Structure formats: C-alpha cells, structure tokens
Amino acid sequence: MNLDYLDFEQPIVELEEKIQALDNIKDKADIVDEMGALKIKSNALTKKIFSSLSDWQISQLARHPKRLYTLDYISHVFDEFTELHGDRIYGDDHAIIGGIARLDAQPVMFIGQQKGRTTQEKLKYNFGMPRPEGYRKALRLMKLSEKFSMPIITFIDTPGAYPGIGAEERGQSEAIAKNLFEMSTLATPIISVVIGEGGSGGALAIGVADIIMMFKYSIYSVISPEGCASILYKDATKANLAAESLKLTSAHLKENGLIDIIIDEPLGGIHRDPSQAKVLLKEALIQQLNEIKQLPIEQLLQNRQEKLLNFGKFKD
C-alpha cells in the first residue's frame, strides 16, 4: 500500500506502478500493446472512482499529502511577487503569506494560508493555523491595497485558526472579527479561492470577498468532519457521516449560494497533474479579475453587502 495516496486511490496506484515497471524495461517492442491497454484501463478506472466520490472522500482529497499549497502556486500564477512581513504590533506569522504581485500584468495584493509538507515546514507554518498576528498582517496588507486601489486575492487553506493559549491571550477572536468587519467594506475588489481546506473562522477571516471560488475537491465548513463527529456522535471515526451532514463540498456550497464559482481539477485531483491545476487557477483568476475591475466601487460594495445579507436565507 502506497502511503502517499488515499485508500480509494490504491487500485489506480497499483495500475500506474505496473505501467511504470513496464516503462522501465529497455526493449519495449513486445510490451507496447500491454502498456497501452493498462493506460486505458487506468484512465477508465480513475474516471469511474472520481465520478462517485462521497463527501468524506472529497474531504480527504482536500487534505491530500500531495495536494498543492499556496507557495506551490505563487511563482506559476503571479509575476514579481514581493513578500511583505509583520503586523506592526507583535510579529510575523508564517502561516499567512502576503505581498504585492502581478497577475496578467495587473498589480494585486496577494494573501494566502500556507501549511507545510515536511516536519520542519509544518512547524514553521504552524500546520496552516494562523495566529492573531497573521490575521492582523493580512488586514494591514488589505488596507494598503485599498489605499493604492489594488485588487486583493486570497488563497484559503487552513484547518482553522490556531487555538493555543498565547493566540487567545493576544486576541484571536478579535483579530478574526475585525477582519470580517473591515473586509465587508474595503473599497477594492476582493477574490477568494479555497484551494484545499477551508476551516471555520480561520478561513473566513480572509474569505469575505466579491467573488468566492473553490477547487472542485476542496472543502469549506464551520468545523472539520472529525470535530463534528466527536460532538454529535461522540465518535470521531464517524467523520464520514458528519461530512455528509455538513454539506462542505464545492457542489453543495454552490447549490446553497455560498460560493460563486467551482474551478475544475485535473482527472484524479490536483496532485495528479499539478501543472494543469496551476493553469486552471490562473485562467479563472484572470477572468474574474478582468470582469470585476469593470464595476464601479460603489456598485462593488453594494453587491458585496447584498451577498453577505443573503447568506443564510432559505426557502421551504
């Protein structure tokens, strides 16, 4: 069993390993047909598995160990990225990356949450859980972008805001609440993209936007499936049941009017074709940025207010 892949991906991985083993043979004259048949079989199996994923399986894909993180996208989506540091109050939180960049030659302010892949990186980025100084840094950069009329682009990928004692002492809840308040009236366009995991207030604190997009196999929820299962069922192993109830996938959120656009993923998920995922993200951002720039600021703010006020409305 390949530990870099999820359990439901294992049949696909086994076929790919067979294809790779055949590809390593120097004289391929006698195995060309066999390789071709295996590739067709692998592609068909991938389509079959990914056409009927459960909400829990999508939740697992959103946290896939090989899924791209914020820093994986920056150099491919943006040009001339210059990182800015610190909240000018306490310190610099590495879990939130921010700075000035260009998207299709247009100056933008970029802010994104970063997790980390190795043990050292996970500690550096605090497993993608921002502290108050991270959210205050984000707000400082947002205010700067408003001053210079630069659109804001945020990448959301966090299990949630850091719940440590120090973070609470430094005003975690206040920092999140202030971001929500300020972002609702920032006089500049805001585009947010959930690239992986959107966890509760930790995600919302950089997610109040004019356009909210999600990758197809990302999630956005008030609580993790495991946390929900622990509360509702007193059993974290029932996370699959909780995931179904939370309606946390991009399809459910789009249907309920909580997000605007779903960005498609390569067959098998982002980790199967990272290069294609970067292209899809960049194209979606450029398209939305070009459209949203056409709106007068007054209209933009009015639309944003209406969007926020419509959250939670439902029909019997």
From Swiss-Prot:
Pfam families linked: ACCA (PF03255)
PROSITE patterns per the UniProt record, alphabetical: COA_CT_CTER (PS50989)
Gene Ontology molecular function terms on file: acetyl-CoA carboxylase activity; ATP binding; carboxyl- or carbamoyltransferase activity
EC number of this enzyme: 2.1.3.15
Catalytic activity: N(6)-carboxybiotinyl-L-lysyl-[protein] + acetyl-CoA = N(6)-biotinyl-L-lysyl-[protein] + malonyl-CoA
Keywords associated with the record: ATP-binding, Cytoplasm, Fatty acid biosynthesis, Fatty acid metabolism, Lipid biosynthesis, Lipid metabolism, Nucleotide-binding, Transferase
Entry's Gene Ontology cellular component terms: acetyl-CoA carboxylase complex
Positions of the CoA carboxyltransferase C-terminal domain: 24-291
Main localisation: cytoplasm
Pathway involvement of the protein, from the record: Lipid metabolism; malonyl-CoA biosynthesis; malonyl-CoA from acetyl-CoA: step 1/1
One GO process term, biological-process aspect: fatty acid biosynthetic process
Compartment annotation: Cytoplasm
Complex and partners: Acetyl-CoA carboxylase is a heterohexamer composed of biotin carboxyl carrier protein (AccB), biotin carboxylase (AccC) and two subunits each of ACCase subunit alpha (AccA) and ACCase subunit beta (AccD).
NCBIfam families per record: accA, AccA_sub, PRK05724.1
Function: Component of the acetyl coenzyme A carboxylase (ACC) complex. First, biotin carboxylase catalyzes the carboxylation of biotin on its carrier protein (BCCP) and then the CO(2) group is transferred by the carboxyltransferase to acetyl-CoA to form malonyl-CoA.
Family the UniProt entry places it in: Belongs to the AccA family.
Stated name of the protein: Acetyl-coenzyme A carboxylase carboxyl transferase subunit alpha
Naturally occurring in which organism (per UniProt): Ruthia magnifica subsp. Calyptogena magnifica
Primary gene name: accA
